[in-house]
Amino acid sequence: MAIQRTFSIIKPNAVKKNVIGAIYNRFESAGFSIVAAKMLHLTREQAEGFYEEHKGRPFFDGLVEFMTSGPIMVQVLEGENAIQRHRDLMGATNPDNALAGTLRADYADSFTENAVHGSDSEASAAREIAYFFTENEICPR
């Protein structure tokens, strides 16, 4: 297995619930190293830029509204097969379909307010990490 990096967001609803520490504990318990992290409040322009690939879809405006509704945590996780393992830990996008014990089963409120985001491919991970972090902000451990 290769060591990979993946990008992760703890979304506004999970930040508001004060479960950042619980989610970070789950990341570390699953064998991920958190190699970069910061809290920020997205502007509309930042959210639209990040979700550019979804522009024109029916859920786009609601997604942007939600992602700008409060602070988020963005982080880079590192570990073996990190992209797929992080997606498995998150659970299904729709929390109604998420397996028990996944982050979305435990912390999501709805399809849109689904608590967390994670990269779905190496290309997405590279783009998403670069959107929020410079190489100097990532500290391999």
UniProtKB/Swiss-Prot annotation:
ATP binds at residues 11, 59, 87, 93, 104, 114. It is found in: Cytoplasm. Its EC number is 2.7.4.6. The active site is at 117 (pros-phosphohistidine intermediate). InterPro entries: NDK-like_dom (IPR034907), NDK-like_dom_sf (IPR036850), Nucleoside_diP_kinase (IPR001564), Nucleoside_diP_kinase_AS (IPR023005). GO terms for biological process: CTP biosynthetic process; GTP biosynthetic process; UTP biosynthetic process. One of its GO terms (molecular function) is metal ion binding. PROSITE patterns: NDPK, NDPK_LIKE. Its cofactor is Mg(2+). It is an enzyme of class 2 (transferase). It catalyses: a 2'-deoxyribonucleoside 5'-diphosphate + ATP = a 2'-deoxyribonucleoside 5'-triphosphate + ADP; a ribonucleoside 5'-diphosphate + ATP = a ribonucleoside 5'-triphosphate + ADP. Keywords: ATP-binding, Cytoplasm, Kinase, Magnesium, Metal-binding, Nucleotide metabolism, Nucleotide-binding, Phosphoprotein, Transferase. GO terms for cellular component: cytoplasm. PANTHER family: NUCLEOSIDE DIPHOSPHATE KINASE, NUCLEOSIDE DIPHOSPHATE KINASE DDB_G0292928-RELATED. Belongs to the NDK family. Major role in the synthesis of nucleoside triphosphates other than ATP. The ATP gamma phosphate is transferred to the NDP beta phosphate via a ping-pong mechanism, using a phosphorylated active-site intermediate. Homotetramer. This is Nucleoside diphosphate kinase. The gene is ndk.
